[in-house]
Amino acid sequence: MLCVAGARLKRELDATATVLANRQDESEQSRKRLIEQSREFKKNTPEDLRKQVAPLLKSFQGEIDALSKRSKEAEAAFLNVYKRLIDVPDPVPALDLGQQLQLKVQRLHDIETENQKLRETLEEYNKEFAEVKNQEVTIKALKEKIREYEQTLKNQAETIALEKEQKLQNDFAEKERKLQETQMSTTSKLEEAEHKVQSLQTALEKTRTELFDLKTKYDEETTAKADEIEMIMTDLERANQRAEVAQREAETLREQLSSANHSLQLASQIQKAPDVEQAIEVLTRSSLEVELAAKEREIAQLVEDVQRLQASLTKLRENSASQISQLEQQLSAKNSTLKQLEEKLKGQADYEEVKKELNILKSMEFAPSEGAGTQDAAKPLEVLLLEKNRSLQSENAALRISNSDLSGSARRKGKDQPESRRPGSLPAPPPSQLPRNPGEQASNTNGTHQFSPAGLSQDFFSSSLASPSLPLASTGKFALNSLLQRQLMQSFYSKAMQEAGSTSMIFSTGPYSTNSISSQSPLQQSPDVNGMAPSPSQSESAGSVSEGEEMDTAEIARQVKEQLIKHNIGQRIFGHYVLGLSQGSVSEILARPKPWNKLTVRGKEPFHKMKQFLSDEQNILALRSIQGRQRENPGQSLNRLFQEVPKRRNGSEGNITTRIRASETGSDEAIKSILEQAKRELQVQKTAEPAQPSSASGSGNSDDAIRSILQQARREMEAQQAALDPALKQAPLSQSDITILTPKLLSTSPMPTVSSYPPLAISLKKPSAAPEAGASALPNPPALKKEAQDAPGLDPQGAADCAQGVLRQVKNEVGRSGAWKDHWWSAVQPERRNAASSEEAKAEETGGGKEKGSGGSGGGSQPRAERSQLQGPSSSEYWKEWPSAESPYSQSSELSLTGASRSETPQNSPLPSSPIVPMSKPTKPSVPPLTPEQYEVYMYQEVDTIELTRQVKEKLAKNGICQRIFGEKVLGLSQGSVSDMLSRPKPWSKLTQKGREPFIRMQLWLNGELGQGVLPVQGQQQGPVLHSVTSLQDPLQQGCVSSESTPKTSASCSPAPESPMSSSESVKSLTELVQQPCPPIEASKDSKPPEPSDPPASDSQPTTPLPLSGHSALSIQELVAMSPELDTYGITKRVKEVLTDNNLGQRLFGETILGLTQGSVSDLLARPKPWHKLSLKGREPFVRMQLWLNDPNNVEKLMDMKRMEKKAYMKRRHSSVSDSQPCEPPSVGTEYSQGASPQPQHQLKKPRVVLAPEEKEALKRAYQQKPYPSPKTIEDLATQLNLKTSTVINWFHNYRSRIRRELFIEEIQAGSQGQAGASDSPSARSGRAAPSSEGDSCDGVEATEGPGSADTEEPKSQGEAEREEVPRPAEQTEPPPSGTPGPDDARDDDHEGGPVEGPGPLPSPASATATAAPAAPEDAATSAAAAPGEGPAAPSSAPPPSNSSSSSAPRRPSSLQSLFGLPEAAGARDSRDNPLRKKKAANLNSIIHRLEKAASREEPIEWEF
């Protein structure tokens, strides 16, 4: 009731207030009329009458004055009361509270009466109880009954126990039988293993004998060749001798010829001699010539013979050299296979003992469970332990339940069901299924061609199946499980290998279609090693898919979805590894499978693969382990590991095990990788032991066995490394070469590999969890092979040759070697691979060892690093090129590569001085995967997601944890996803399994089982580096999370000018920002230096952004290196908002804050790259922007810069105008623009175009008629005004953008300020749309538009108070002559330029033309008061009330402020203001404003009498 009465009272008060205001206006009008009438009376009446009436009129006037004074005081008192009433809080809550208290009091009375009644009943019960006590007879009877019941219960228990005992005995007998069966199977397997060892030994002996034969053949051939060469050499010598003899003869003949010539001359002299002598001479001469020609022919023939002999000799040399190299290659290949076999035997020396121990342990500890048969042989120890534990628990529970059988039979069912369900969730893969369909498992792409393992080498299968990429259950839990199964599979496959015979052929051409080698042209034309025919193209062979076999696609899709959900495998992983398709395609296929008959050949492929995938449990488990590892290491993206999509599609089979193998060479590497994996899993197990004591209970013996294996392996590897050390010392390989070599070797794997063995040197000290590519897949053309295999032993020269050969190969192959080539080499030529692998492994060890010495962890970086290193750039160039570190080892290689050249470029290199600082890209949120137990606990319960998210939000708020950290550390999600999930949680029933996982994680986090590292711990700082990282993270994070903290200066903000930050101060404030998580405003204000006395004082400032020199130059780069991942899109968005809100230019911001040109800033803000794609240099601007956004005084500092630039510009303009030198160099301005401009300082700026007032008027009139003029109009205007067309175009463009900007600022302020639109009458609002109202003020308070309106003064945006324009009075509608500019034009020249031709601030808004009668006094005053902080209030257009309006302007804002407070205060006091309230407030504001104006108005006119 009271609330209604209050509302009514307020309405009445509003009404009375409006009435008062209206009356006030009326009294004003009547008063004016009275004054007019009194004047007329004074003029018209005779003087004597005036004298008689004067005292009466004066008394009337006095009375009227008194009355008006009284009414004003009364109105003032009313206003005071009214204001207080408006501020009175709502009494409704207090009344509600009173009512509640009253209800409570009534309830208390009721409770008291109830208590009284209860006491009475209690007394009655006490009496009854006393009576009952006396009845001992009944008690005796009850005791007898109890005895009888106990007797019956005992009998029942005994009978049940007897039955149970019988059942247990039967079970025991059954289990014993099964145990015997398993023992039989293990003995058979042991025999198989012995067979395998024998076959290996025979194979070894055979290869040895073959090797010896080859050696003898090689020796024979070499001796034969040597003999041939000797013979050829002797022939050559003979030929040379003959040639020399011929030359000698030729010389003698030449001598004879010269003598003959001489004799001829003599003969010619003796002409008078007889004819006989002449005839003789002629004869002798002709015979000499014939002889000479014959000799010359002989010489030519001899020269040809010599050349022919030399050619044949070179040919022979080349042939023999090639044959020798081939023989050497064969020899080295045989040597390497021999070595591998020996190492394999060594490695498997204690294999039998371990196997025996494990089998004994199994047979002693665990009797096999029901319904398994041979499958149980494959079950690892932990699974058996768990099953035994469960069976014992269930038996125990069953006994307990049977004891309490009388009371609760229902409870037993409840316990049995989950017990029976659990073992099913962890199925052990039976390897006994493997031999049944080996061909089906390895079927090729099309799903039909059988690929028999009989034709493959044992290395192929042992490496593919024993590689650590197939942990058969989630990590840590089943270390022994995975080890045992791998070894069992290895034994089976190597047994299968025996059938292929021990010939040197690795692939037989028969049993499988050539199409299984996914080779594409150009290599298709070349037959492979064993003369196998080139395969037909993919498209031809794809037609051979069996069309007859129908499949139920819907059923297959359903089964796949079930398996994926059951094992928590994502569709992306499934699509990637099994189908070779994207996540979207997989989702489409599984959601809407087409019927079989409607599918194309290509469309049927995925279903073949899915069927193959479902056919074997191994595939599913392998994929599950990959999924688990992906969740552990989400930073390594799939794209990085597997870039060859077409290759993957060609070679993909439904059987996952053939696709996930690493291309390792030889079983020795495989064994090493098994041991490495076992070691890792043991470590994981140790850490997991406290959490899972039951699983670790019986694994003591097996742990010791595995440890002994590991120690032996380590000893062997240390011995190998010791053998390699001398080679390492002498090998002439620079560190950089090795750094290149290692990544190249590690980055060319052709197969999709998940994890393979790391280089030996790394694996000794630091087992790598990151996936690496195998080293064996490097393409090996003969030239490289020859070099790599020249040294079969471990001589240092050989290692160096190999490394240099690989280097050369890297250089050649960087541009052109394709993935198909890698694949072809890995698939078709495994023996060549094996031959090269030992040398490459050496090279890897070399790389690994040296890198360890230099502080890097050794590993793969990007090919771009290799390229840049080959070309030899400086470290700074190298850093510019460096992509965001994509490889797990890139961090170390960056360190090692740039370590040497750091001294050259201390400033340029963005490396931190300490190698502790992490520099690799911040990984995506990584969280450990949930265990199956955690899933089971919550997955099938109904969880209240709304309540859960509420609790999480409360806990986050209480502990001050931001959503980004929570998302990264607990949920593995981005901040956006977390925010979305917490604000709008879906109901549990509508969530998929993947969607439920975050909520399960939240629940576990609330229970304290997950992500405890997220909670802030006081006083734990790990060294200064980490401290600086966290301190940086806080201000950055503060900026990221709360976008409200962005400073937005309103139109009224115009602080006093201050100088830009000097270099030292800026560094100081930067470091303060970094070290204070929430920078206090006072501290950053202190960092601003006082205003310099004269402009040239800042000459000494360097021209870099936030200038950093010497030590501080590193600080910003260290910040960049240590900064967490930033949201570049969010930062640029907020920067753009702040710049537009405050009318700041990108040029100023770029030069002052970022040290970039306007173009670069514009590009950065328009198209920001994501953080992880940026180099360190590219991240710097974003870190600077973030620091700038976090600085509370950022806008003010830029404003100061802008004002100083403007002042400098104005000075320059004035001086240039006065000296008639329009092209004066802009020396003063450049002092203030802190950015290093691209042009040198002495270059001249273009002069600014300054338009005359009449030109501006004409252009404005043209604009009002047509804001977008046609080219013809532009040309006409240009000719009329004698301007360039470009100037006119620019003026229109600038004018349009200025008006748009004003409207935009106006809207922003109207939205952000409570008092916006204070006098926004509907007519004024409608006037806003009209193009003629350019004079609207920025605050949203316009002059009233009507037939007699004049445009009032227009306040400028911030920082433009110096350029305020005086509005034109109505009389000056015509443009004044150029000689006598109007009052506003004198100043108009200074800032109302035409188009901006050079860099510089945009022209300020122009005043519109004033075309009508004066505005009403109130409106003029209102608009003058609208922008209180923007400089002097402008005089209104109408001359009479101008004094009053200007004098009352300062007073009004304060009264408004006292009534409504400033917008910030209002926002803080009541943030729930809805638009309705705002309108109401604005309306009241206008009424009170008018009343106050009337009350406080000084009398403008005195009484006449």
UniProtKB/Swiss-Prot annotation:
Identify its protein family: Belongs to the CUT homeobox family.
Which protein are we looking at? Homeobox protein cut-like 1
Segments of the chain annotated as binding DNA: 542-629, 934-1021, 1117-1204, 1244-1303
Which GO annotations describe the biological process of this protein? Answer: negative regulation of transcription by RNA polymerase II; positive regulation of dendrite morphogenesis; regulation of transcription by RNA polymerase II
Specify residue ranges for compositional bias: Polar residues.
396-407, 440-451, 868-877, 887-911, 1036-1049, 1230-1242
Chain positions of site Cleavage: Q643, E644, S747, T748, S749, P750, M751, P752, T753, V754, S755
Its chief place of residence is nucleus
The disorder on record is: Global developmental delay with or without impaired intellectual development: An autosomal dominant disorder characterized by global developmental delay associated with mild-to-moderate intellectual disability, hypotonia and short stature in some patients.
InterPro entries xrefs: CUT_dom, HD, Homeobox_CS, Homeodomain-like_sf, Lambda_DNA-bd_dom_sf
Gene from which the chain derives: CUX1
Per the entry, what this protein does is: Transcription factor involved in the control of neuronal differentiation in the brain. Regulates dendrite development and branching, and dendritic spine formation in cortical layers II-III. Also involved in the control of synaptogenesis. In addition, it has probably a broad role in mammalian development as a repressor of developmentally regulated gene expression. May act by preventing binding of positively-activing CCAAT factors to promoters. Component of nf-munr repressor; binds to the matrix attachment regions (MARs) (5' and 3') of the immunoglobulin heavy chain enhancer.
Pfam hit, one? CUT
User: Where in or outside the cell?
Assistant: Nucleus
Assembly and interaction partners: Interacts with BANP. Interacts with SATB1 (via DNA-binding domains); the interaction inhibits the attachment of both proteins to DNA.
